[in-house]
Amino acid sequence: MSVVGFDVGNLSSYIAVARGGGIETMANEYSDRLTPSVVSFGEKSRTQGHAARSQAITNYKNTLSQFKRFIARQFSDPSVQKDAHVVPYKVTQLPNGNVGMQVQYLGETETFTPEQIYAMILTKLKATAEVNLCRKVVDCVISVPQYYTDLERRGVIHAAEIAGLNCLRVISDTTAVALAYGIYKQDLPTPEEKPRNVVFVDCGHSSLQVSVCAFNKGKLKVLANASDKNLGGRDFDWLLAEHFAVDFQTRYKMDVKSNQRAWLRLMAECDKTKKLMSANATVISMNIECIMNDRDVSGKISRADFEALAAELLKRVEVPLKSVLEQTKLKPEDIHSIEIVGGSSRIPSIKETIKKVFKKECSTTLNQDEAVARGCALQCAILSPTFRVRDFTVTDLTPYPIELEWKGTEGEDGSMEVSHKNHQAPFSKMLTFYRKEPFELVARYADTNLPLPERRIGRFKINGVFPTAEGESSKIKVKVRVDGHGIFKVSSASLIEKLPAQAEDAMEDSSPEENGPSKEEGSGASQSENDAPMDQSPVEGGAGEGEASADKEEQAENGAKETSKDKDQTSEGSKSDKESKDQNSEGSKSDNGSTETDAKATKKNKKTIKTHELTITASTDELSIAEVNNFFEKEGKMIAQDRLEKEKNDAKNAVEEYVYDMREKLCDKFEQYVSEKERGSFSKLLEETENWLYEDGEDETKSVYQAKITSLKKIGDPIENRYKEKHERPVAFEELGKALMLYGKTLDLYSQGDEKYSHIEKDEMAKVEKCLKEKEAWRDSKTSAQNQKAAYQDPVVTAQQIRSEIQSMKFICDPIINKPKPKPKEEPPKDNGPTPAEAAKDGGPAPTTEGEEKMDTGDQAPTGEASKEGETKPDETKPDVEMELD
C-alpha cells in the first residue's frame, strides 16, 4: 500500500512519500521536486507540469493555471470575475452556473471544469510517484487552503476520484505543516503540562494563511485560523509589473498591457526580480529583449523602492496575524515560536512584518516549499494500516460557524447553530425532532464574511417519517457530523417507536422480514420527550465512538435505576416474608395470588422501544456521481491519447536520432567498414529520410516511423556489426588460444606420468587430444580466411562463434581432466577383544585404560608419604579454572 501526500499549490505542486522509515520528496522526470501546476492543450495532446509551463507564453490561450481559485465557485462570484480578468485563458459560465475553462484541444473547442483540471495535475503527480515507487498509487492525502468551504473540499475529493485516487483525508495546509513540525519534536511538554503555542504562517502564491497550534507530547490541537485568500506572491508580482508598465509607457511609449504575450513576459521577469531583491539589497536591473514590436526594454528597482510600493500589501499582512491573537486571547509572549513556510515568506518585508506583530524572530526550521507535502504524507501514514507511526493525535477546527434551519410543524421556521467558529473537528451531534411526516433540514454557514457569496451547504431530507399509533408526532433522532475532511453531512436518522406489551408479543412471533430493518432498545430512552422542538447532545469523538459512548452512558444510567429498583423490591419482599411467618397458610396463598396479579399487570403495562432507520436524501451543489464517472472516463481517454502521442513522438525521435548518428559515424568510426559505393547510397537514403521527417513524415503514425527505422537498420546494422566484430573478434581468439594452451599443458603432464592425472584412462585422454587438434585446425583456418577479407566485408567468423567453440571444447575436456581420483580402500578394523561396554554387558570385569586407573587412584584416600606430599590445605585448594579480572 502506497503512502503518498500531494500538495497542489496555486503555482506549483509537491509529492512526498513515506518509506524507509522517513519522509521523502519525489523528483519528476526533470529531476526537479517542484512540478508546476499548469496544464497545456494542443492539437494532438495535452501536457502537464514543466512541459506545460514552457508553453505558458507561446500557447497562453490554451495553457491553464491558477485553477484552484475556481473550484466549486459560481461564475457570478466577484472573486471569480476578478481572477478571470487576470488569467490569459477564457473563463466561461457552465449551464449550472459554475466556472468553465475553454481551450482548443484536438482541433475542437473544449470546456473543462476546474475539478477536471485539478484531476489532470493529480494524474501527473500520481504518475511521477508511481515511477519513483515502482508500484500503483491509490491512497493519498491532499492539502487544501484552510479557508476552503464545504463545496470546495468536496470538489477536491471529486478531482481525486476523477484521477483514480482514493483521498483518505483532505487536510488544511497549515495543519499539515503543524503535523510535520510536531511529530518529530522530542521536547514537547507532557499532556499534564502547559501546551507549547506555535504560530504557523504560510505565504504562498495567491493567499496568506496563519494558524496557532498548541502542542503536547503526542498531541496537536489547532486553536485558531485566519487568512487572506487574496494576498500572496502574485500580488507583489502584479505590483512590480504595474510599476514597470508605467515606466515603459513613459520612457518607450509602449503599452505592454495591450499585448497579452508581452504582459506575461513582463510578469515572469518581475517574479525573477522579486526573488533577486529578496536575496540582495542592491539595485536590481531588468532587461527584456523584443518584448513588443521587436523592441528591447530595461528597468531598475531597489528593495527600498519595492517596499514603498508594497506598503498597502504589507499592512494587509498584519490583519490575519493579529486576528489569531485576538481569537485565542494570547499575548505575543505566550507564543513559543513562529514558523514560516511558503515561497513568498522569503520576502524580507513580510518577515519584518511578522516579527513586528509577534515581537519574535521568524523560524525557518521547516522546508519552506515541501513542508505541506511532508505533512500530508505523515497524515497518510497515520491513516494507513500498513505503517507504524508514533502516536500523534491531530485535532483540527471548523473555519466557519454552521447552522441548521427547518420548517416547524405549524409553519414556523426554526434554526440553531450546530458549530461555532473554531469548533474542534471532526465532531458529531445528536439532534431530536418531533414530526409526523418527512421533513427537510437546510445547512448553511452562519458567517456573513464567508469568501463565497452562497452560504448554503446543502439540503437534507429525512424520509420515511410516520406518526405514532395515537396520531401524535414521532420522535426522530438525527446525527449531524463534520468529518475529517471538514465536510458537513447528516450521517444518520432514526425514528423511535414505543410499543405496548401486546405489540411486543406480536412482534416476537413475527419474522424479521415482516418487521423490516429495526433494532430493539431497553426501556430507558436516550432522551426524554419534552415540549422543546429539539434537543442536542454533543459527541466529541468519531461517529461510531459517539454513538457507543452515548449508549454506554444510557445503559449505565438505566442499569443503576434498575438496580436500585431491585433493591427496593428485595427489601419489601424480605419484610413481607417476615410478616408471612405470623400468618396462616391460607393468608399466605392469598398474598401470593395478589402478588402474581400485580406482576401480570406490571408486565402488561411495560413498554418497549423499536428503532426504525430512516433514509436521507442529500442535495448539494457538488458534482453528481454520473458527472464524476463521465469525467473519469474522459480522463482515461485523454491519458490513452497522451500515451499514444508520446509513443509516436518517441518513434519519430528515434528515426531522427538514428539519421544524425549514423550519418556522422559513416565518415568517422565506420569509414573503413563500408565501401565507397555503399556509403554513397546509404548517405543519400539518410538525407532523404531527414527531408521526409520535416515534410511528408512530420505527422505520421507510430507504425510508419517504426517501419522507417527498420528499413534503415537493415543497411546500418551490418556496418555496425563489422565495426563491433573488428574489436571483439581478437579478444575471443585470445580466449580460445589460452584454453588450447591450458589443455595442451595438461596433456604434457599426463604423458610425463604426473601423479595428478594417473587415474585417467588413455582412451579418455585420447579424446581430449583429438578435440584439441580439431579446435587448433579450426582456429588456424578461420584466422587465415578472415585475414584475406577486407574490413568492409562481412566477417568469416564472429566472436560469438569463437566463444561457442570454446564452450564445446570445455564440454568435452573438463569432465575428463577434472575427474576426481578414486578413494583408497579402507582395511577392516582388527578384532582386539570385546569393548568395555560389551564386557560389562556379558557380566565380566570391564577392562580399563591406564588413564582410568590413575583417575580411580586419585579418588582414593592417600596413604603414606605420598599422601602427605599430595595433601593440600582447604584454603589452598585450586579452582578448576583460573580467571584474571582486569
From Swiss-Prot:
Entry's localization field: Cytoplasm
InterPro entries: ATPase_NBD (IPR043129), Heat_shock_70_CS (IPR018181), HSP70_C_sf (IPR029048), HSP70_peptide-bd_sf (IPR029047), Hsp_70_fam (IPR013126)
Residue spans of biased composition, Polar residues class: 585-594
Recorded GO MF terms: ATP binding; ATP-dependent protein folding chaperone
Entry GO terms, CC: cytosol; nucleus
Start-end of Basic and acidic residues biased regions: 549-584, 866-886
One Pfam family in the UniProt entry: HSP70
Keyword set, alphabetical order: ATP-binding, Cytoplasm, Nucleotide-binding
Annotated segments matching region Disordered: 501-614, 775-795, 813-886
Family membership: Belongs to the heat shock protein 70 family.
Protein name in UniProt: 97 kDa heat shock protein
The species this protein was found in: Mesocentrotus franciscanus
